[in-house]
């Protein structure tokens, strides 16, 4: 995403997207609407002057809609807005990672207003903190939170730096984790297959049995990060 100076950004919360997904024919249309946070949010806050929100044409078989849809805005232009909204949909938010690495503040809807419904995020989401990396909002207090953001411009600008630093560190940790995962997987695949002429195939595979995993302690996670950093530095030399 191309950088845009903070003072030159549009003072609105920006979002573009679709609301597609598999249709559950056993659920009434009214109930499907109630469980659609994106439609509900756009109905509630679109046109209030605080948000720049729009659904895009949803034709999965025709990529040329990007040239004909008047609401379409390419990804590299998103930083023209000071705040980027992340709305949960039918699955995880594929664009949240890009928003957190941009030069704009991320406004994150965490309460969709549906009892028992929880947004789905990727592995890096657990460390994100409200008012540190993102501005968390709900269906009810979205307008109030955005007005607060406008009145606390310095806090939001620092939030951008915090989210960028967080994603930079997490990206490094992710690379190290994948590296270690593939190394462990390669060790598990070190076996000698056998073939019997009396049958099509008989494989005798012996691998290590992994123990039941648990959530690592803080000191264990810190040690893993330190070791990852050391390995990456050694690999870069």
Regions inferred by a protein language model and the residue ranges of each:
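Phosphate-/polyanion-interacting regions in eukaryotic proteins
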Residues: 1-74
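Catalytic binding pocket for nucleotide-activated donors in carbohydrate/polymer assembly enzymes
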Residues: 72-235
């Amino acid at each position: 995403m191309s950088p845009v100076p903070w003072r030159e950004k549009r003072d609105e919360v920006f979002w573009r997207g679709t609301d597609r997904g598999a249709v559950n024919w056993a659920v009434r249309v009214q109930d499907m609407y109630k469980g659609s946070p994106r439609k509900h949010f756009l109905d509630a806050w679109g046109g209030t002057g605080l948000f720049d929100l729009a659904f895009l044409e949803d034709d999965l078989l025709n990529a040329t809609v990007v040239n004909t849809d008047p609401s379409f805005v390419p990804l590299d232009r998103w930083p023209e807005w000071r705040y980027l909204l992340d709305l949960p949909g039918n699955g995880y938010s594929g664009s949240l990672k890009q928003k957190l690495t941009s030069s704009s503040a991320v406004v994150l809807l965490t309460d969709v207003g549906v009892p028992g419904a929880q947004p789905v995020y990727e592995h890096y989401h657990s460390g994100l903190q409200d008012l540190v990396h993102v501005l968390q909002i709900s269906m009810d207090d979205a307008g109030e939170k955005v007005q607060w953001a406008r009145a606390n411009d310095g806090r939001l600008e620092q939030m951008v730096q915090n989210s960028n630093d967080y994603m930079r560190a997490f990206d490094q940790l992710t690379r190290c984790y994948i590296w270690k995962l593939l190394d462990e997987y390669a060790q598990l695949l070190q076996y000698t297959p056998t073939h019997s002429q009396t049958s099509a195939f008989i494989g005798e595979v012996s691998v290590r049995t992994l123990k039941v995993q648990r959530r690592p302690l803080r000191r264990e996670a810190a040690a893993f990060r330190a070791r990852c950093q050391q390995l990456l530095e050694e690999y870069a030399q």
